[in-house]
């Protein structure tokens, strides 16, 4: 599976897992929300191990840009708040950084 696809799936799993904690602590949802949230966070961690790189830190660093894009998508789709131009500019810079990390000659 291509790294971008892994990172995209990992971002969805991480955001969904973290949102369950947000829902529990900030929105008053039941603590039972944490069960699928913890499973989702475990899937997130497992997915990052599938990236073809010898160094975990590099996989995590490259993932950061994808996470930012996915978070802004979550903001828009799940929370109904449209990202502004500063959000999009920051995301573009982060995504460029991820691309440099992933594609750099080694």
From Swiss-Prot:
Membrane topology summary: Multi-pass membrane protein
Tagged with keyword S-adenosyl-L-methionine: no
Keyword hit for Ribonucleoprotein: no
Subcellular location: Cell inner membrane
GO CC, any one term: plasma membrane
Keywords, alphabetical: Cell inner membrane, Cell membrane, Membrane, Transmembrane, Transmembrane helix
Transmembrane segments: 4-24, 31-51, 61-81
Descriptive protein name: UPF0060 membrane protein Smed_0659
Species in which this protein is naturally found: Sinorhizobium medicae (strain WSM419)
Lineage: Bacteria, Pseudomonadati, Pseudomonadota, Alphaproteobacteria, Hyphomicrobiales
């Amino acid at each position: 599976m291509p790294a971008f696809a892994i990172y995209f799936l990992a971002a969805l799993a991480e955001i969904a897992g973290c949102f369950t904690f947000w829902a529990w602590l900030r929105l008053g949802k039941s603590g039972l929300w944490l069960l699928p949230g913890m499973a989702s966070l475990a899937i997130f961690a497992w997915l990052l191990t599938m990236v073809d790189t010898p160094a975990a830190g590099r996989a995590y660093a490259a993932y950061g840009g994808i996470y930012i894009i996915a978070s802004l998508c979550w903001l828009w789709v799940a929370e109904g708040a449209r990202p502004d131009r500063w959000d999009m500019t920051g995301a573009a810079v982060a995504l460029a950084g991820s691309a440099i990390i992933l594609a750099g000659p080694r």
